[in-house]
């Protein structure tokens, strides 16, 4: 006979084991690899995720690390939508990292991050503006 039930039980068990605190369904840590060492980074310390030629996370303290993920969609699924917002194709930002949001004439918004990430200016379509404002104003 087929052994599917037991393998699905195993995966359930594994899920429970790898996430003992099932109350939080969002990812609490990301692992970065630095010089062949692994380092756990708390999700709340991440200012933004960026998809460039390589993928990076910028921390609130200004550090930047390469991180393994295929798409930002896949990262978005793991994050608390109250905490993180998908600004555009390239960035997901932490509400705690936002310094200012400035509408510019060619129908977009420029999001400036707090020190020490102030060099990061993130463009967002003006179409997202009402939703984004509502997201920030809580």
Regions found by a protein language model. Give the residues of each.
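Conserved binding/recognition cores within well-folded domains
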Residues: 2-119
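C-terminal output/interaction extensions
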Residues: 122, 130-138
